[in-house]
From Swiss-Prot:
Official protein name in the record: Ribonuclease P protein component
GO cellular component: ribonuclease P complex
An annotated GO BP: tRNA 5'-leader removal
Quaternary assembly: Consists of a catalytic RNA component (M1 or rnpB) and a protein subunit.
Function: RNaseP catalyzes the removal of the 5'-leader sequence from pre-tRNA to produce the mature 5'-terminus. It can also cleave other RNA substrates such as 4.5S RNA. The protein component plays an auxiliary but essential role in vivo by binding to the 5'-leader sequence and broadening the substrate specificity of the ribozyme.
Length: 141
């Protein structure tokens, strides 16, 4: 029998806040924050090298029924498909957008897998979106 990688949950506010300081990966269906844990953090949390995931669905997405449906769809997509792409000793926080409710399940799993495996991708090759002016004399002085 094939052993599945156990994916643990983020439950405490402090855990969510530390992941928030990590790398952000934006997509049309959700925003994903990713942070690698140090060995000390993994030992302190007694999680080993298992990946952990937390879900956030804000009230602007709808009432409790809609928010829970979005959360359940994301959990199932992680459990069935995208969980195998998760790196060990890494925490993920998924902030759902309203479009995650009506998107086809195949698109949801594909988008999750793409965002999980993307490491440090930037649109413009690492350059800033807006260029800063060169430092120089002020008012011709």
């Amino acid at each position: 029998m094939k052993s599945k990688k156990q994916i643990l949950r983020l439950r405490k506010r402090a855990e969510f806040l530390t992941v928030r300081n990590g790398e952000k990966r934006r997509g049309p269906l959700f925003l994903m924050a990713v942070r690698e844990r140090t060995e000390e953090e993994s030992n302190a949390a007694k999680t080993g090298d298992n990946p952990r995931v937390g879900f956030t669905v804000t009230k602007k997405n709808g009432n409790a029924v809609i928010r829970n449906r979005i959360r359940r769809r994301l959990k199932e997509a992680i459990r069935c498909h995208a969980g195998r792409d998760m790196a060990p000793s890494t925490d993920y926080v998924i902030v759902a957008r309203e479009q995650a409710l009506n998107a086809p399940f195949s698109q949801l799993t594909e988008e999750l897998s793409r965002r999980i495996t993307a490491k440090g991708e930037r649109r413009s090759g690492g350059k800033r979106r807006t260029e800063r002016p060169e430092p120089g004399p002020v008012n011709g002085k």
